[in-house]
Amino acid sequence: MGASAATGMQMVAARPCISASQGMLTSRAAVSRIGRALSTTTGFATCPRICYSSPLGSSKRSGVAIRAMSSESGPQGLPIDLRGKRAFIAGVADDNGYGWAIAKALAAAGAEILVGTWVPALNIFETSLRRGKFDESRKLPDGSLMEIVKVYPLDAVYDSPEDVPEDVKGNKRYAGSSNWTVKEVAESVKNDFGSIDILVHSLANGPEVTKPLLETSRRGYLAALSASSYSFVSLLQHFLPIMNPGGASISLTYIASERAIPGYGGGMSSAKAALESDTKVLAFEAGRKGKIRVNTISAGPLGSRAAKAIGFIEKMIEYSYVNAPLQKELLADEVGNTAAFLVSPLASAITGSTVYVDNGLNTMGLAVDSPTISS
């Protein structure tokens, strides 16, 4: 994780200045009582010190200016603390995607990490972990290595063993693995750990992603929705019973859900639109049923191995760099840090939202690198 993660996972508390010029606060005792009440109800780790000041320097001033100051002792700001929390991250198969970055951010905040890896990629992933090939990218801000407590085989296209077709059961890429449908994985996690607090969906696949929508088959279109959007519904459906109240779930989406991105085809744009719509519905249902928050992160393009299947990911990254308000490289860690915030108590009132982490590209309605504009 980048250096920013070491200190960047903190939200600096604002310092409001409240005037009492109307005589609403007439004594320091009253102010102290209010200060104590605020520190109790907000749940801040450090009680703010209430400082009294008179900018005019006059003892005749009737009002009292109040400024909340952080204590000189103890941690500054609002640290993201996920100690004692357990996260299951579905869709981690290497060390260069958003799923991995989210796992690192949650681990850096203290969470216990479980991952679900696509069955055909399981052997390579576990072997790479065991041989230390990921050790450099496992490094956390404190110098330790992210620990993945357990890796589960997972294919989120199938809800239960009854859904798996015979040709998949006999496929050699699935040989030696068992209990990898969504229902079975949820049951395995329950048997192994009892419960989780955080569920992350980092899954997407469109077998015809390089085809224009007008050339996409029904089978390819539905496959994209099944793997990229319904898989989130299925995961939450099966994991919700073992999620602790107050927990959170997040997924990853893309701006193609609402804008035409030529080349991002095969029904993938539709799948992302469905994912964002489902996020709102699931936020209501999971919130009422299990007190679970549900959000999605609309991340900018990243040159991960999975994204290279699109065929023009490097051009998408360059386009983003040139046209986004923030002309800088988008780091996977920035998405990871956003995820850590969204699943933390600091985001306890945020649910059903699509949060953009793309250097602001989603705000643009005109490509500034267009020859028409540049000329």
From Swiss-Prot:
It is an enzyme of class 1 (oxidoreductase). Residues 1-67 form a transit peptide. Disulfide bonds: none annotated. Its EC number is 1.3.1.9. Pfam families: adh_short_C2. InterPro entries: Enoyl-ACP_Rdtase_NADH, NAD(P)-bd_dom_sf, SDR_fam. NAD(+) binds at G91, Y98, D155, A156, S202, L203, L252, K272, L302, G303, S304, R305, A306. The active site is at Y254, Y264. CDD domains: ENR_SDR (cd05372). One of its GO terms (molecular function) is enoyl-[acyl-carrier-protein] reductase (NADH) activity. It catalyses: a 2,3-saturated acyl-[ACP] + NAD(+) = a (2E)-enoyl-[ACP] + NADH + H(+). Pathway: Lipid metabolism; fatty acid biosynthesis. Keywords: Chloroplast, Fatty acid biosynthesis, Fatty acid metabolism, Lipid biosynthesis, Lipid metabolism, NAD, Oxidoreductase, Plastid, Transit peptide. One of its GO terms (biological process) is fatty acid biosynthetic process. Belongs to the short-chain dehydrogenases/reductases (SDR) family. FabI subfamily. Catalyzes the NAD-dependent reduction of a carbon-carbon double bond in an enoyl moiety that is covalently linked to an acyl carrier protein (ACP). Catalyzes the last reduction step in the de novo synthesis cycle of fatty acids. Involved in the elongation cycle of fatty acids which are used in lipid metabolism. Required for normal plant growth. Homotetramer. This is Enoyl-[acyl-carrier-protein] reductase [NADH] 1, chloroplastic. It comes from Oryza sativa subsp. japonica.
